[in-house]
């Protein structure tokens, strides 16, 4: 039901409970604190709304739950405010209160959608609050792989979901541009620049083997200039002995490549934060010194240890190794201090499940600083790995990266690019990229983050109801076609439909579709509260299913004006909610397919 109706019904039920409690307990009724929870029954025949408050309060009020439910229903239906909202009420099982909403209450969603348009489903309840959402945060050592793609989809959609509740969302990408892997990137590029290739004598053991390393080396030798979206241009010097120049060029080159990956995926960030800046600005040293002064560290075997067990970790952790270098979680602590200092009291990190072990360490470090950061800061959403399948076989390599499938591979393949075409980007048109982006974004958000995901390229290419993104987009396109035909055949424009006589919508299929439309705002709120962006994809598949059921049951383009316009109004509202939900997913809503 619509949020406004839900709030009204909750208030009416709470008032009814108070009346009954007072009648049973007198002055002692003030101690009764009901929790009114409204849910949609799993079986449609049981009504539109179910409430278990009678079973909650039967014992405190010293009565039978079914009898209590009957008294609550009697009090509820006697209230003037309920008479236009509730059509019928019945008691089920041990004391469930099942309510049927009035036809007018169900139909109200159509007017709400027409009135609010693209804003339908959104809320300003969190207006004035801000959230920092960090995601992707890949090392600039290669193209983005499919795991990064899942993280990008989760992060971007979750950002949209949270923003729908009024939050100001700051999207941030943390570049791990310092450390051993960056050194490996530099020596890999240097080896390629010297004419070596994987398998040759002298090829570094820790080197990256993808063909992209050869591309970097070629451009470095040719004196090409590269630039990331937020950085200064870097020119290749061609000096194969200058490892620092090679490192700088290679990192910038790959940051540019990752920028292009993200652009193809439709993901934008507000800020890119460089790990190297934490060192150059002295933030890592400052954080370590503060932990030492706070008594959170000790020396052992030439290393500096953090007392993470004080904050619930299973053992203390090394911060600074005996060779003077820091372990990887230390700059993470310093980085999160900057998030707090920048005023972000709510922070969400999206990471692979293989990073689970760092959570306790980072939180322990933050708590050990005693600067007011609350326990449990930051929040985490952990996701599991993605397996790519094509023609029944797992795909493990690509021409771009060598040892893994990249995000751009996945987008191009899912858009219909033939195997091998990814090596010739001039053959990939914008329509292919759009189809691929839509499929990849929808697929990667269509499962809970904590479940492993098998991405089936063949399924992404199917144009039938087995393909979930096609199924949802086709529902939108089909409605657009019907509304165009309505204009062509009957000269009825969508702008005229808010005046339709909605009392014509009497079928079970129409009622079920209206109920599903009304659930959209609460679904978004739930998805934001639970950090569950997959809920949007689940909802859209269900909504498309309800639409198809209605459309198959009732003809819309009939000569009788009243039922025709009422059914068309319901379709127009459904089209708007499909568009709104697809926009949250960052997926297009085509008018034709």
From Swiss-Prot:
It comes from the Bacteria. Its EC number is 6.1.1.19. Keywords: Aminoacyl-tRNA synthetase, ATP-binding, Cytoplasm, Ligase, Nucleotide-binding, Protein biosynthesis. Pfam families: Arg_tRNA_synt_N, DALR_1, tRNA-synt_1d. InterPro entries: aa-tRNA-synth_I_CS, Arg-tRNA-ligase, Arg-tRNA-synth_N, Arg-tRNA-synth_N_sf, ArgRS_core, DALR_anticod-bd, Rossmann-like_a/b/a_fold, tRNAsynth_Ia_anticodon-bd. SUPFAM superfamilies: Anticodon-binding domain of a subclass of class I aminoacyl-tRNA synthetases (SSF47323), Arginyl-tRNA synthetase (ArgRS), N-terminal 'additional' domain (SSF55190), Nucleotidylyl transferase (SSF52374). GO terms for molecular function: arginine-tRNA ligase activity; ATP binding. GO terms for cellular component: cytoplasm. It is found in: Cytoplasm. It catalyses: tRNA(Arg) + L-arginine + ATP = L-arginyl-tRNA(Arg) + AMP + diphosphate. GO terms for biological process: arginyl-tRNA aminoacylation. A motif ('HIGH' region) lies at residues 138-148. The keyword Transmembrane does not apply. Its main location: cytoplasm. Monomer. Belongs to the class-I aminoacyl-tRNA synthetase family. This is Arginine--tRNA ligase. It comes from Burkholderia lata (strain ATCC 17760 / DSM 23089 / LMG 22485 / NCIMB 9086 / R18194 / 383). The gene is argS.
């Amino acid at each position: 039901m619509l949020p406004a109706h839900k709030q009204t019904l909750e208030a009416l039920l709470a008032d009814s409970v108070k009346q009954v409690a007072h009648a049973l307990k007198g002055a002692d009724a003030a101690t009764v604190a009901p929790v009114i929870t409204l849910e949609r029954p799993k079986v449609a025949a049981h009504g539109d709304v179910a409430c278990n408050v009678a079973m909650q309060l039967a014992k405190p009020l010293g009565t039978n739950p079914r009898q209590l439910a009957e008294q609550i229903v009697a009090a509820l239906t006697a209230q003037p405010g309920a008479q236009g909202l509730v059509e019928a009420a019945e008691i089920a099982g041990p004391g469930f209160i099942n309510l049927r909403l009035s036809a007018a209450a169900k139909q109200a969603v159509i007017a709400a959608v027409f009135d609010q348009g693209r804003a339908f489903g959104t809320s300003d309840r969190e207006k004035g609050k801000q959230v920092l959402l960090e995601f992707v945060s890949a090392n600039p050592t290669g193209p983005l792989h499919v795991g990064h793609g899942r993280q990008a989809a989760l992060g971007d959609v979750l950002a949209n979901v949270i923003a729908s509740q009024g939050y100001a969302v700051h999207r941030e990408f943390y570049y791990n541009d310092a450390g051993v892997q960056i050194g490996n990137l530099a020596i890999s590029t240097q080896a390629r620049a010297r004419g070596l290739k994987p398998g040759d004598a002298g090829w570094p053991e820790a080197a990256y083997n993808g063909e992209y390393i050869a591309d970097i080396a070629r451009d470095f030798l040719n004196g090409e200039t590269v630039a990331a979206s937020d950085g200064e241009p870097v020119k290749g010097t061609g000096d194969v002995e200058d490892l620092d120049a090679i490192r700088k060029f290679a990192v910038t080159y790959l940051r540019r490549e990752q920028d292009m990956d993200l652009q193809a995926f439709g993901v934008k960030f507000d800020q890119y934060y460089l790990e190297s800046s934490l060192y150059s600005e002295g933030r890592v040293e400052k954080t370590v010194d503060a932990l030492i002064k706070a008594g959170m560290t000790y020396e052992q075997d030439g290393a500096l240890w953090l007392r993470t067990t004080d904050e619930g970790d299973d053992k203390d952790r090394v911060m600074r190794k005996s060779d003077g270098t820091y372990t990887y979680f230390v700059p993470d602590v310093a980085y999160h201090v900057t998030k707090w200092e920048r005023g972000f009291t709510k922070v969400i990190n999206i990471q692979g499940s293989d990073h689970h072990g760092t959570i306790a360490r980072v939180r322990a470090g933050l708590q050990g600083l005693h600067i007011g950061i609350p326990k449990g800061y930051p929040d985490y959403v952990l996701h599991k790995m993605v397996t790519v399948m094509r023609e029944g076989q797992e795909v493990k390599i690509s021409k771009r990266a060598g040892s893994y499938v990249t995000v751009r591979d996945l987008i191009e393949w899912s858009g219909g690019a033939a195997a091998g075409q990814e090596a010739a980007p001039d053959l990939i048109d914008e329509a292919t990229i759009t189809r691929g982006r839509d499929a990849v974004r929808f697929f990667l958000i269509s499962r809970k983050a904590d479940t492993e995901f098998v991405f089936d390229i063949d399924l992404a290419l199917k144009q039938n109801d087995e393909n979930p993104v096609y199924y949802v987009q086709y529902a939108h396109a089909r409605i657009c076609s019907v509304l165009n035909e309505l204009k062509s055949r009957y000269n009825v424009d969508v702008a005229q439909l808010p005046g339709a006589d909605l009392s014509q919508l009497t079928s079970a299929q129409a009622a079920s579709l209206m109920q599903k439309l009304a659930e959209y705002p609460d679904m978004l709120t739930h998805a934001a509260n639970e950090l569950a962006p997959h809920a949007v994809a689940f909802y859209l598949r269900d909504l498309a299913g309800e639409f198809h059921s209605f459309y198959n049951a009732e003809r819309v383009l009939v000569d009788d004006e009243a039922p025709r316009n009422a059914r068309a109004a319901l379709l127009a509202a459904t089209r708007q909610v499909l568009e709104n939900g697809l926009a949250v997913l960052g997926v297009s809503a085509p008018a034709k397919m």
